[in-house]
Amino acid sequence: MAVDVGHVASQLVSTDRTREPGFDRFSFVPFLRKSYGFGLVTDVPVCKAYSEGHCPLGPACPDRHPTPSRVTTSTTTASGLAPSTTHGSLVCKHFLKGLCKKGMKCEYLHEYNLRRMPECQSFSRSGYCPNGDDCLYQHVREQARLPPCEHYDQGFCPLGPLCAKRHVRRRLCPYYVAGFCPEGPNCANAHPRWSENLPKPTIRVEKTEEELEHERNLIREEQEREREREREWRNERGRGGFGMRGRYRGRGRG
């Protein structure tokens, strides 16, 4: 059977946008957007009419209709508390498991966005996560969470590698050190601010291997208790559903 090599090659190098893979190509995304008003984050702009209070197009609107938890103009949340900049930028961990009871009133995001996942509590406490690379949450290294050292930023820290703060290597701008840099804030080099009242540097305290192993055991026990609670919750749901069907089935026979 003859094969048109030119036709096959043209299909492989085709620039058709519909052939490109992407998260917005999932079949369940239209259902999420139409039924619940949330879905995957895209570059679609927010609907101006919806932001002002009402959009006549409803779910058929081509623009985004963010949930109330993502609207930053409100002064209070559903719980009556002041809005949190952290809550409005993190994905709800219960939503990912299908167990969020707050629904549209949840203070966290109900969407699938790996870049907005909350920080893994297990990894943040001991640097260990039993899920490893399969964990859906962010693994932030302890060194990245440390504040920068003011002494090091000004040129020298007497504690060196023992300092409890982060030493970020930056190249000082020679023009700024001399007195004036024509690039100003757009300069690619560092422009340190010289402060007269710097806090004294402190020595970093490292945990022993026994302390780390104890924290890992506590994390494993906590995760096992959480799995047990989820199993009990699902079993109760299942028993309740079968009970309802059993009652209706019994009435029909009588």
Swiss-Prot record:
Positions of transmembrane segments: none
List all Basic and acidic residues biased stretches. 207-239
Supply the alphabetized keyword list.
Metal-binding, mRNA processing, Nucleus, Repeat, RNA-binding, Zinc, Zinc-finger
Q: List, in alphabetical order, the GO biological process terms annotated in this UniProt record.
A: mRNA processing
Alphabetical list of Pfam families matching this protein? zf-CCCH (PF00642), zf-CCCH_2 (PF14608)
Q: Where's it found, cell-wise? A: Nucleus
Annotated region (Disordered) at 65-84, 207-254
Q: Where is the composition biased (Low complexity)?
A: 68-84
Q: Which domain of life is it from?
A: Eukaryota
Q: GO MF annotations for this entry?
A: RNA binding; zinc ion binding
Zinc finger (C3H1-type) positions are 42-68, 91-113, 114-142, 143-167, 168-194
Q: Does the entry feature the keyword Membrane, yes or no?
A: no
Q: What GO cellular component entries does it have?
A: cytosol; mRNA cleavage and polyadenylation specificity factor complex
Xref: InterPro entries: CPSF4/Yth1 (IPR045348), Znf_CCCH (IPR000571), Znf_CCCH_sf (IPR036855)
Similarity remark: Belongs to the CPSF4/YTH1 family.
Q: What does this protein do?
A: Component of the cleavage factor I (CF I) involved in pre-mRNA 3'-end processing.
**Protein name per UniProt:** mRNA 3'-end-processing protein yth1
